[in-house]
Amino acid sequence: MNTNKIALIYNKNSKHLAIIEEIKKLFNYCKIEDAEVIIIIGGDGELLHNIHRYMHLNIPFYGLNLGSLGFLMNPLDTKKLLQNIYESTVSVLNPLLMQAEDTNGQIYKALAINEVSIFRKTNQAAKFRIDINGVERMSELVADGALVATPAGSSAYNLSAGGPILPLASNMLCLTPICSFRPRRWHGALLLSSATIKFEILNITKRPVNATADFQEFNNITRVTVKSTKDQHIKLLFNKNHTLEDRIIKEQFGE
């Protein structure tokens, strides 16, 4: 991507301000609204927060890793920064759309790039029913919770919960239980990205749950519907020798 219209986003309280100042000297950056590329400096958390904030602009994001986690980021190389951006490859992500209803009947909608999760709010395990495309597939799951992950998010919370890593182009979603108690040996399911997943919370008074879409959390939820969005696209830029697809493969071999 050959462009001189580059915006720069970073945490003003970052402990890496000296490095950031060096990066700022490499080019004349512009306003975010005028940019053709947005560089986000930090870690995966900083990237996700700013993607949520600016995804409506349909501008590609280039993450530059100065954080502790950087799976969706590019390594810092100030000498080749502009060259890496110009020669970068594009990964297109479709976020998940979560619709959740709480005990007061309030409806919440939120997008998730990595995963939507539901989790017990107290020491009591959660109980819920799972429907896929309008068909009941599990009458009762007893667990700490469950999550639905995108391919890009499958190597994050989903992997820690015992779910599989998905290739980026798989057009699949992971449905993964979190510390499942009943059925004890159920490890989840792989679903087409066109699937609609619905969780109906059981015994909500005694066993309340929260729902999250990435970092957005909603309390005392009675039902959650999750599906992949087709009208919302996020473009992430990666160095040509450090693509997201390659990282997903490496993660499966513990590299």
From Swiss-Prot:
State the species of origin: Rickettsia typhi (strain ATCC VR-144 / Wilmington)
Q: Name one cellular component (GO) term.
A: cytoplasm
Designated name of the protein: NAD kinase
Spell out the family assignment given in the record's similarity comment.
Answer: Belongs to the NAD kinase family.
Describe its function.
Involved in the regulation of the intracellular balance of NAD and NADP, and is a key enzyme in the biosynthesis of NADP. Catalyzes specifically the phosphorylation on 2'-hydroxyl of the adenosine moiety of NAD to yield NADP.
Q: Name one GO biological process term.
A: NAD metabolic process
Assigned EC number? 2.7.1.23
| Positions contributing to NAD(+) binding | 44-45, 49, 114-115, 144, 152, 155-160, 216
Catalytic site: 44
Q: Which reaction does it catalyse?
A: NAD(+) + ATP = ADP + NADP(+) + H(+)
* Keywords of the record: ATP-binding, Cytoplasm, Kinase, NAD, NADP, Nucleotide-binding, Transferase
A molecular function (GO) term: NAD binding
A Pfam entry, by short name: NAD_kinase_C
Compartments in which it is found: Cytoplasm
Catalytic EC class = transferase
* HAMAP family for the chain: NAD_kinase (MF_00361)
Required co-factor(s) are: a divalent metal cation
Cross-referenced Gene3D superfamilies: Probable inorganic polyphosphate/atp-NAD kinase, domain 1, Probable inorganic polyphosphate/atp-NAD kinase, domain 2
